[in-house]
């Protein structure tokens, strides 16, 4: 096969991949539109109770009303708390994972505690955290960190331990220090592990923030959901849930962009 034929086949292959991506996106949008149309139709025909389930037109009306009544403030509060909790949970989790990888003794001592903490429902710690930290933003951020921290430690530590043993043996043969093994082998080999941690943590941090806002906040999307439920404004609840889904999707998309950037940078190094 000559170079021209190979280039043509590659272009055809890439074109098919692009077409498949567009087809997937189009199908997703079509499903969403059909779902919303069916929801609106069933509510208008009173087949479902719009007071309980709301409907797209009422949600849109609620959204436009919220836009003129501090909606951006509520979105910003939840986003800010999530980002702080996400960054702290990820950073502390990776640092602790490195410390545990460095010290086999500490790793074995902490293992049962980490397993117990991981299986413990973190939301149940909410009242304790509020008493310790106080009601307000700090308590919400601590809850976000508490939910994401242990998962980050376990996932990264597992990645460090499973790093190619032959590479580490070779480095030891050349009398590399533990720090050199960490920076030259462990960390570069676990970029995908770090990225996976980010993907998981953005969702976990948001869960922690919303749980905290349910308990103590007077602003944020979690607060809007609780308030809407208390005064039986189901339109407000559904609108807040949808906005929350959009915020979560945008945050996850940001992590995917970061992943592409890191992999692209690594590829051309």
Where are these regions (language model features)?
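Transmembrane-helix boundary motif in ABC transporter permease subunits
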Residues: 84-114
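Loop-to-helix entry region at the N-terminal start of transmembrane alpha-helices
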Residues: 73-81, 123, 131-152, 236-241
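Membrane-cytosol interface at the C-terminal ends of specific transmembrane alpha-helices
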Residues: 104, 137-201
